[in-house]
C-alpha cells in the first residue's frame, strides 16, 4: 500500500492492527523529512470509475456468480457498475436498469428496482449474468402495486419492501 505524511510518500508491503511492515520512505520522487506525531497520515487512492454524473445515494451488493467475488453499485442515476476483485469497473449496459436505487443478488440472478421512471418494476437478469437481460435466457421483470424502496434476501426468500407494503 501507500501512505502520505505531508509531502512524503511511503510504501508498505504488510499491515496488522498496530504496525506497517516493509516500509520504504521517500518513494515516487518525494524527499524524506522529519514528521511530528500530530501530522496527518493519509492513504493515496486511485479513481476506479469516472464519468458517474449526479449520483445520489449508493447501494451495494456483494455477489459471486462465476467463482469471482464482485460488488455491484447502484446510485439512482447512472448505469449500475460492477467491481471485480482487481477493482476493474464495468457498467451494466442496459437502459432498463439505469437509475436503479436498489439491487439484490438472489438465486443467481441480479434484481434491480426503484427507478424513478418505473418505481413499481423490478428487473432481473439472466442466471449467473448480472449484465444479461434476454428473456429467452431467463431474465425478465415483475411489477408490484407500490413503489419499491428496498430489496432484501433473507434465507430462501427475496423480500420486496415498498412504501406501503412488503412482498
How would you describe each model-predicted region?
Residues 2-57:
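Small/polar beta-strand repeat architecture
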Residues 1-2, 99:
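Alpha-helix initiation/capping motif
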Residues 43-167:
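Recognizes the extracellular SEMA beta-propeller fold with strongest preference
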Amino acid at each position: 500500500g501507500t501512505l502520505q505524511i505531508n509531502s512524503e510518500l511511503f510504501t508498505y508491503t504488510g499491515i496488522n492492527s498496530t504496525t506497517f511492515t516493509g516500509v520504504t520512505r521517500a518513494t515516487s520522487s518525494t524527499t524524506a523529512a522529519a514528521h511530528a506525531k500530530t501530522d496527518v497520515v493519509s492513504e493515496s487512492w486511485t479513481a476506479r470509475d469516472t464519468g458517474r454524473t449526479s449520483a445520489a445515494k449508493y447501494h451495494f451488493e456483494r455477489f459471486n456468480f462465476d467463482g469471482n467475488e464482485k460488488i455491484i453499485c447502484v446510485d439512482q442515476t447512472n448505469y449500475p457498475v460492477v467491481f471485480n476483485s482487481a477493482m476493474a469497473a464495468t457498467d451494466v449496459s442496459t437502459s432498463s436498469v439505469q437509475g436503479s436505487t436498489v439491487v439484490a443478488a438472489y438465486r443467481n440472478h441480479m434484481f434491480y428496482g426503484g427507478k424513478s421512471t418505473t418505481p413499481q418494476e423490478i428487473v432481473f437478469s439472466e442466471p449467473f449474468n448480472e449484465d444479461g437481460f434476454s428473456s429467452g435466457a431467463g431474465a425478465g421483470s415483475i411489477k408490484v402495486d407500490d413503489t419499491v424502496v428496498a430489496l432484501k434476501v433473507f434465507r430462501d426468500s427475496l423480500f420486496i419492501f415498498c412504501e406501503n407494503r412488503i412482498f
